[in-house]
Amino acid sequence: ESLPLAAFHQVDVYTAK
């Protein structure tokens, strides 16, 4: 499942900001 993984990565980028 790559979809859920991508979502988690996106959240990381948002929190990193």
Swiss-Prot record:
It comes from the Eukaryota. This is Unknown protein 4. It comes from Daucus carota.
